[in-house]
């Protein structure tokens, strides 16, 4: 039987602002990426997110981003590898400490937004992030875009690497995600998106925007839980994966 992890970005509310539908999405996933206070979240939300995932028996991952609350961490910033390492270590240490205080530990780390995309193409940036993770916990799993520099850097650092794919995003021939401003960036047809996931998991290929099939490794599928439609999609993708002999389980069970 095939295995895959379903992950979602959570804990992105802060102060009086509520973002996402965490309570409804948590039971549907196997790994949670919790924001660490830079692009979103705050200490209270972080603790609440840990409590919710613990109660549901879901594995916790840190979701560090750039220090850009106004831009939700989606705007590129000119940062050095040294800054990337410090930003990462600062955020995962905060969330990791809260996890420890609640009898939990971080399973994985997945950078957020612009930091994720920048690192996917920049080996030096990826290496700095992975060095921070290795310094924090050499057993932690690094989640990054399948085939990216982040995956290469993780392996070079001796870390466990989990290749992530996206159900609702288009791919370029080089394996990178199509820019959101370009045509073909988003897969809006649910059945098409799910069929692509099944193919990525079982066949290890995905069709790029050019129409060419490219190789891809699918250890984890990112799903979004903001909005009722997205919630229904997650329920549907779980059902179809199970019907196609794909077992949904946390990264720790897949990467080992």
Task: Locate the predicted segments by residue.
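Active-site rim beta-loop-alpha module in soluble metabolic enzymes
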Residues: 147-206
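Acidic (Asp/Glu)-rich catalytic clusters
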Residues: 23-27, 48-61, 100-102
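Active-site-adjacent beta->alpha loops and helix N-cap segments on the catalytic face
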Residues: 15-21, 40-52, 120-127, 146-155
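Glycine/small-residue-rich loop that forms an oxyanion/phosphate-binding "nest" at active or ligand-binding sites
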Residues: 68-108
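Glycine-rich tight-turn/loop motif centered on a GG-T
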Residues: 18, 22, 32-39, 70-85, ...
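C-terminal domain-boundary segment and adjacent tail
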Residues: 140, 232-256
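Flexible, glycine/charged-enriched surface loops at secondary-structure junctions
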Residues: 99-107, 204-215, 245-254
């Amino acid at each position: 039987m095939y295995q895959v992890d379903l992950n979602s970005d959570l804990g992105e509310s802060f102060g009086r602002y509520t973002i996402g539908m965490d309570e409804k999405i948590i039971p549907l996933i196997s790994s949670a990426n919790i924001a660490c206070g830079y692009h979103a979240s705050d200490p209270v939300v972080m603790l609440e997110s840990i409590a919710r995932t613990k109660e549901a028996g879901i594995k916790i991952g840190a979701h560090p981003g750039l220090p850009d609350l106004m831009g939700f961490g989606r705007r590129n910033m000119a940062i050095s590898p040294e800054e990337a390492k410090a930003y990462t270590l600062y955020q995962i240490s905060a969330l990791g400490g809260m996890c420890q205080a609640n009898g939990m530990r971080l399973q994985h780390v997945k950078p957020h937004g612009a930091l994720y995309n920048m690192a996917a193409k920049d080996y030096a940036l990826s290496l700095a992030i992975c060095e921070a993770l290795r310094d924090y916990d050499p057993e932690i799993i690094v989640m990054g875009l399948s085939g990216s520099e982040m995956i290469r850097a993780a392996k070079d650092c001796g870390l466990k690497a989990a290749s992530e794919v996206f159900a609702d995003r288009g791919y370029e021939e080089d394996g990178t995600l199509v820019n959101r401003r370009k045509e073909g960036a988003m897969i809006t047809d649910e059945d098409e998106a799910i069929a692509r996931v099944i193919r990525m998991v079982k066949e290890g290929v995905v069709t790029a925007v050019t129409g060419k099939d490219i190789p891809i490794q699918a250890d984890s599928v990112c799903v979004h839980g903001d909005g009722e439609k997205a919630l229904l999609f997650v329920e549907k993708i779980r059902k179809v994966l199970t019907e196609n002999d794909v077992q949904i389980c946390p990264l720790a069970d897949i990467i080992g």
